[in-house]
């Protein structure tokens, strides 16, 4: 998802210059500051930082947002991201390599990797650790993680190594996710639960979010993870029911995912449940609204909505680039439907750090309330 520096400059350069190729008559009616900007042209920072997107309003964007037959959509300006860099970014990357750990941030090419790993406004670095290796037994058409029928065996040292890494970073909120491991008897539930236990042993105050597979619908595996001591149980439905077969591996489906989320709350009512939906795959507004209602009916607490971005040419094409204004609309709808938290934006992902600050406070409040009862 994240673009390399040169690819970014090369692919976006023609769009940026082309967008500002005005006639002399059009230029004469512009404010002085904008004339000066057009005269000087964009610099390198405009290509890599997203600053250019702030110089015009989104409703002025003239490019196509919906894909026509046979075409590939161009990236709109609001989806440009900063190139990852900084001390925190390098520190996290080095620790991961030394302990042979993987992150979904890298494997899924997340566009927020620089912001989350580098810290940002809150100066707190966040990485989503991907357990059970870097190879998945599923083949979802939106995902860039490697796939194989028989991935390498689980690393017995991974739970302890993960706890060591988190302790070294000094984080107080961590997200654990994993590949699907249909080749393992319990889908890896015991492995995930053990990792949570190791984290809590080293730091009882740490808050742990687990973004889990569907475990082939095995509710005993769901229960094992839900009762492991985690604070947030997340499982992504990914898209609306009507697009499940097109987007996800045939072994996954909406109803199965809904049962996973519902069962986690049934066996551990104090856990915060969370899911995520990608937009831009061809869904309709009516389908999105019905999906949100179904999630609330299953007692899902938190929701994230983000733009689907095609990771490689082999994956599903983007059908539509949803505007930031439309994402704001879905955030409002989610809050009106009763979700405790709705994060909705083009670059929002299920593990996006903005939600974690809210969830941290939400979990803390629930624990305080429970202790007073």
UniProtKB/Swiss-Prot annotation:
Cofactor note: Binds 2 [4Fe-4S] clusters per subunit. One cluster is coordinated with 3 cysteines and an exchangeable S-adenosyl-L-methionine.
Record-stated family: Belongs to the radical SAM superfamily. Lipoyl synthase family.
Official protein name in the record: Lipoyl synthase, mitochondrial
CDD domains xref list: Radical_SAM
The Radical SAM core domain, residue ranges: 121-340
Binding site residues for [4Fe-4S] cluster 2: 136, 140, 143
Recorded metabolic or biological pathway in which this protein acts: Protein modification; protein lipoylation via endogenous pathway; protein N(6)-(lipoyl)lysine from octanoyl-[acyl-carrier-protein]: step 2/2
Tissues in which the protein is found: Expressed predominantly in heart, testis, and liver.
A Pfam match: LIAS_N
Presence of keyword Disulfide bond: no
Location in the cell: Mitochondrion
Organism of provenance: Mus musculus (Mouse)
Key words, A-Z: 4Fe-4S, Iron, Iron-sulfur, Metal-binding, Mitochondrion, S-adenosyl-L-methionine, Transferase, Transit peptide
Catalytic activity line of the entry: [[Fe-S] cluster scaffold protein carrying a second [4Fe-4S](2+) cluster] + N(6)-octanoyl-L-lysyl-[protein] + 2 oxidized [2Fe-2S]-[ferredoxin] + 2 S-adenosyl-L-methionine + 4 H(+) = [[Fe-S] cluster scaffold protein] + N(6)-[(R)-dihydrolipoyl]-L-lysyl-[protein] + 4 Fe(3+) + 2 hydrogen sulfide + 2 5'-deoxyadenosine + 2 L-methionine + 2 reduced [2Fe-2S]-[ferredoxin]
GO cellular component: mitochondrion
Cofactor(s), by name: [4Fe-4S] cluster
SUPFAM superfamilies hit by this protein: Radical SAM enzymes
Binding site for [4Fe-4S] cluster 1: 105, 110, 116, 351
GO molecular function, one term: metal ion binding
Boundaries of the annotated transit peptide in chain numbering: 1-26
Keyword Metal-binding among record annotations: yes
Enzyme Commission designation: 2.8.1.8
Gene Ontology BP term (one): response to oxidative stress
